[in-house]
Amino acid sequence: MATAGMLLKLNSQMNREFYASNLYLHLSNWCSEQSLNGTATFLRAQAQSNVTQMMRMFNFMKSVGATPIVKAIDVPGEKLNSLEELFQKTMEEYEQRSSTLAQLADEAKELNDDSTVNFLRDLEKEQQHDGLLLQTILDEVRSAKLAGMCPVQTDQHVLNVVSHQLH
């Protein structure tokens, strides 16, 4: 059974997923404004994935008798200048969420809370896939920049990379 402290940390992680979904929607909007529609579509799908993770955490917490609390968040509003900057930001955010998720899993293991450990390890596996995809995209965006591709060409390249990775 999850301890009260663990449940508070799970609640915080759930809110990180909520923040990530909002961040990805914000970044998607920026891409749409730049006519980078392939990347915008990818980021909206990532936002949906984060909402799904958030709901899984919400449901897990309810199943163990907790009362999850989704908190209000500040809307991300940073100015972006490039796809490279955008994907660097997504990687930084991903690494923060991934790190705290791993810490939670380790802590649950120390508490011998097997159901929480199993739940968190499943989430970690899913997030690792997302992290590999984001890193691949960032690497490809950097390569496209070095090759002199314009943003619209890079956007199309990102869409091709995502399509290839998902199939």
Swiss-Prot record:
The keyword Membrane does not apply. It comes from the Bacteria. Its main location: cytoplasm. Residues 1-145 form the Ferritin-like diiron domain. The keyword Cytoplasm applies. It is found in: Cytoplasm. GO terms for cellular component: cytoplasm; cytosol. One of its GO terms (molecular function) is ferrous iron binding. Pfam families: Ferritin (PF00210). Keywords: Cytoplasm. This is Bacterial non-heme ferritin-like protein. The lineage of its organism: Bacteria, Pseudomonadati, Pseudomonadota, Gammaproteobacteria, Enterobacterales.
